[in-house]
Amino acid sequence: MSDSALLNCRQLVTLAGPPGPRTGPAMRELAIIPDGAMRIRDGCIAAVGPRADIVRSLAGDTEVIDAGWRVVLPGFIDAHTHPVFAGTRAAEYEQRAEGATYAEIAAAGGGIRSTVRRTREAGDLELATAARRYTDWFLRGGTTTIEAKSGYGLSLDDELRILKTIRLLNAERRLRYVPTFLGAHEIPDEYRGEIEDYVDLVIQEMLPAVAEDNLAEYCDVFCEPNVFPLDPARAILQAAQSLGLRLRIHADQFTGDYAALLAAELGAATADHLESTTALGLAALHEAGVQPVLLPASVYNLGSARYPAARDMIARGMAVVLATDFNPGSSPTASIPMVLSLASTQMKMTPAESITAVTVNAAHSLGRGSRIGSLEPGKAADFAIHECDDYRELAYFFGREPANAVYLAGQCVYRRSA
């Protein structure tokens, strides 16, 4: 057995509490231990408490992890990312700065389809190398788990290739990856005007191959009238359910109450985006127990002012989740701290609510609430030591990489260079 102890934490932000996702006022309860400490055994948390209590229980040969009187939080859980792709869309970023809209660029063959073309051309090594670079970006912000979508292949072979890259990255044990199949991200060039044929490909070939090799836990669909309308989206998601995959849905990014109602109907784990969802859609999601995953960085990067109604969701008792939506087009950021800042300034979530949304609530949205998301005995020792004096500074000092060191299952996977 390997034993270690984390000591000298100015604030140990544990988020300890009752099982289940947090809602309402409970989202502000972080269970902070000043001068806290933690004992770790074989990659799991063995004990948490005041430093004096933990020190008394240590054996003489216990390895000490010195937090240096910094703030320690659970590793952030980013519940919506697209981390495997080739190239960038910096040219499109410039086009948007000159006045072009996201929809106009997509209609001209850019957007998701441009990344699909570049990704199909890339070799396996190129894809894995790029994704490892992004792994470093996630770690620098204190993230230890990401939900990782495919969606830039849009052919049987290329979707499987992306999911196998995600499996490879997960096996490297620097970051935890939760794989999601997103073959219904866009209609590829060769199927333009033939959506029924492409949906058949997704249902008849892609999904069975994904399920046979256990390459994904979830299936997602970008459900919008001009991408995958309700009937094709429903058919894909029901086929995924029949194969044992759980559901996540890109919902109501542009069209109100379009996909939120579908997410509620099918009992999806999450409905993501929700920028255009009205009270009708929110009521349906709440009643069905679907967790909202809000992506303020994509709203910011697209130059929109339509942020999701986070305060309304919290008032309704919904277990809100925040995520980066890391992707090469609408949200090229892997920074959860930046998302925390946007959540406070643009959606008026408190720093405590935002922390809950990227830890405990995010863990439950991925079916991992009993294993990660808080610093409690029995859970994985996934945590980050941050360069700050108070957890609120993670959102307050925006645009920085706060993590001094990041640990996954008790092992250091990132340390800031001196």
Curated annotation (Swiss-Prot):
One of its GO terms (biological process) is L-histidine catabolic process to glutamate and formamide. SUPFAM superfamilies: Composite domain of metallo-dependent hydrolases (SSF51338), Metallo-dependent hydrolases (SSF51556). N-formimidoyl-L-glutamate binds at residues 152, 327, 329. Its cofactor is Zn(2+); Fe(3+). It catalyses: 4-imidazolone-5-propanoate + H2O = N-formimidoyl-L-glutamate. GO terms for molecular function: imidazolonepropionase activity; iron ion binding; zinc ion binding. Catalyzes the hydrolytic cleavage of the carbon-nitrogen bond in imidazolone-5-propanoate to yield N-formimidoyl-L-glutamate. It is the third step in the universal histidine degradation pathway. This is Imidazolonepropionase. It comes from Solibacter usitatus (strain Ellin6076). The gene is hutI.
